[in-house]
């Protein structure tokens, strides 16, 4: 079975930036991949459409997925508020890796990161569940809107999203 592919159509201050296509590793982390896929489609009545990338640090990552508070303090999974770390088989090997944000072990919700560099120090601490397969140029454009504090100089938003 092919790995599910999902997309984000991104904007900065209301101007289109482009599409990011991500492949989800449902073969290794099925529960984590399904959470992200369903949040992309919005099929549970909530999800990423209209949400923001609230934190972007150049040469590290872009963070999004807080569709409830829009500032990094909220979000929820399709399983309730938080769910367990499925496994740590996949690693943070370089730019374009998708991984779950957490507040410690077994606290996965909807927030996620896209790496813009190798981040191997996060192995065995954050669940990797996929990677960018198209639109890494869009990720780099978004990265350029960040700062060392993580504050973005434009409002970065997911205008549309879904499964391909």
Swiss-Prot record:
In which tissues or organs does this protein occur? Ubiquitous.
Regulation of its function: Binds cyclosporin A (CsA). CsA mediates some of its effects via an inhibitory action on PPIase.
Q: Which cell locations does it reside in?
A: Cytoplasm
GO molecular function list: cyclosporin A binding; peptidyl-prolyl cis-trans isomerase activity
Q: Which InterPro entries match?
A: Cyclophilin-like_dom_sf, Cyclophilin-type_PPIase, Cyclophilin-type_PPIase_CS, Cyclophilin-type_PPIase_dom
Question: What are the alphabetically sorted keywords of the record?
Answer: Cytoplasm, Isomerase, Rotamase
BP term (GO), one: protein folding
Looking at the record, the residues that make up the PPIase cyclophilin-type domain are: 7-163
Q: Which GO terms describe its cellular component?
A: cytoplasm
Q: What class of enzyme is it?
A: isomerase
Enzyme Commission number = 5.2.1.8
Origin superkingdom: Eukaryota
Pfam families recorded for this chain?
Pro_isomerase
Listed under catalytic activity are: [protein]-peptidylproline (omega=180) = [protein]-peptidylproline (omega=0)
Q: Which CDD domains match?
A: cyclophilin_ABH_like (cd01926)
This chain's function reads: PPIases accelerate the folding of proteins. It catalyzes the cis-trans isomerization of proline imidic peptide bonds in oligopeptides.
Task: Tell me its family.
Answer: Belongs to the cyclophilin-type PPIase family. PPIase A subfamily.
Instruction: Check the record and name the PANTHER family matching this protein.
Output: PEPTIDYL-PROLYL CIS-TRANS ISOMERASE, PEPTIDYL-PROLYL CIS-TRANS ISOMERASE D-RELATED
Listed name of the protein? Peptidyl-prolyl cis-trans isomerase
Species, as recorded:
Blattella germanica
Top-level taxonomy: Eukaryota, Metazoa, Ecdysozoa, Arthropoda, Hexapoda
């Amino acid at each position: 079975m092919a790995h599910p592919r999902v997309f984000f159509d991104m904007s900065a201050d209301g101007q289109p930036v482009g599409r990011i296509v991500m492949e989800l590793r449902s073969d290794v982390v099925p529960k984590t991949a399904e959470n992200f896929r369903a949040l992309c489609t919005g099929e549970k009545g909530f999800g990423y459409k209209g949400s923001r990338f609230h934190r972007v640090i150049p040469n590290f990552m872009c963070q999004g997925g807080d569709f409830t508070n829009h500032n990094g303090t909220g979000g929820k999974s399709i399983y309730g508020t938080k769910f367990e770390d499925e496994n740590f088989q996949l690693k943070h090997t370089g730019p374009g890796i998708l991984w779950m944000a957490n507040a410690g072990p077994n606290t996965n919700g909807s927030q996620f990161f896209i790496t813009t560099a190798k981040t191997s120090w996060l192995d065995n601490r954050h669940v990797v569940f996929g990677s960018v397969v198209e639109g890494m140029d869009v990720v780099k454009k978004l990265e350029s809107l960040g700062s060392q504090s993580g504050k973005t100089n434009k409002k970065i938003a997911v205008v549309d999203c879904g499964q391909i």
